[in-house]
Amino acid sequence: MTNLLEDLSFRGLIQQMTDEEGLNKQLNEEKIRLYSGFDPTADSLHIGHLLPILTLRRFQLAGHHPIALVGGATGLIGDPSGKKAERTLNTQDIVVEWSQKIKNQLSRFLDFEAGENPAVIANNFDWIGKLSIIEFLRDVGKNFGINYMLAKDTVSSRIETGISYTEFSYMILQSYDFLNLYREKNCKLQIGGSDQWGNITAGLELIRKSEEEGAKAFGLTIPLVTKADGTKFGKTEGGAIWLDKEKTSPYEFYQFWINTDDRDVVKYLKYFTFLSKEEIEAYAEKTETAPEKREAQKRLAEEVTVLVHGREALEQAVHISQALFSGNIKELSAQDVKVGFKDVPSFEKDRSEELSLVDVLVESKLSPSKRQAREDIQNGAVYINGERQTDIGHLLTAEDRIEDQFTVLRRGKKKYFLITY
């Protein structure tokens, strides 16, 4: 086994592989071209896309030539894989716009200027968009038997609930991508999530039927990322964790990784970082012997946040996290508060308005009544910008505002409210 496949195996990144011996031989003999596809089903990639992206990067670091394929055409159709119902089709204008955004995001992870093996971005609309219906049916469709397609999980799982011809044909279009890249770019390997196995093997079958005998192409799937507690990876109460900082702030992104379960953290270090085997094994031991220190989680959060958002964003995320943990909220800038308290309930007040702390506690619903608000203050349960306030007659002034824009109220340990001005 090549060093690359050994590393992927150590990291648990190989779910299934076609012709392991043949692929191993191919990787030993030459630096190959490989691809993974990303359909623009939203205006940003999310952390579920990180695994195939980083796997492409691992191949590039080993000297191979990655192709990131944006599905400008297949994104108009919709992949039935893993879906229980028909997707809502997006307009071409939206798919074009999203394709460009995804292309920009991919450029953060792959080196498009590497001297000997630069990554390449392709868009399957460039060839599928030119394909006439006659060409599609005669040259591509004739290679697929209905029984063969019905046997694939992506189709068979939808027979009961129903599947349109549009989504039924997705497998054929993705197969045509592989054939086109094989012919035009000499691309010999497709990588995808475990739910793509049926589509990948269909592409290999199309290459086998369409090309001369002895055509060499391979498929490799990576595992579905799971969580030990059974909840869906990449989702929080606030929704998906996106790679776009406007949709998921670097602070929220960092916090997602910091909160990784001890049972998952070593697996995620293998999946999502480029730490060596020795470093990962050292963190595994630390998690075993001193889990309360959460050293592995901190390193995981640092590595992935830098990878996706850069060093400066990591430093801001760490600063906000430390300030919130210690209660030193006054140390934060207005921008930090805006990021760190994005999902906290809030209302807006005029700076000239006289605000009684008791009234604000009731209006914000931190306290159910004025009587309870006074008790909360007297009992030391109320904090303004992290500092305890015990004066029941306190009026909020400019001194209670962070950069004259925000006041952060807290009752007890976890109930926050944000006043904006």
UniProtKB/Swiss-Prot annotation:
Molecular-function annotations in GO: ATP binding; RNA binding; tyrosine-tRNA ligase activity
Domain S4 RNA-binding: 355-421
Reactions listed under catalytic activity: tRNA(Tyr) + L-tyrosine + ATP = L-tyrosyl-tRNA(Tyr) + AMP + diphosphate + H(+)
Record-linked CDD domains: S4 (cd00165), Tyr_Trp_RS_core (cd00395)
Binding residues annotated for ATP, in chain numbering: K235
Keyword tRNA processing carried by entry: no
Origin superkingdom: Bacteria
EC annotation from Swiss-Prot or TrEMBL: 6.1.1.1
Residue numbers binding L-tyrosine: Y35, Y170, Q174
GO biological process terms, semicolon-separated: tyrosyl-tRNA aminoacylation
Main localization, broad class: cytoplasm
Cell compartment(s), UniProt: Cytoplasm
UniProt-listed PROSITE patterns: AA_TRNA_LIGASE_I, S4
Motif 'KMSKS' region boundaries: 232-236
HAMAP family: Tyr_tRNA_synth_type1
Family named by the database record: Belongs to the class-I aminoacyl-tRNA synthetase family. TyrS type 1 subfamily.
Name of the featured protein: Tyrosine--tRNA ligase
Organism of derivation: Bacillus velezensis (strain DSM 23117 / BGSC 10A6 / LMG 26770 / FZB42)
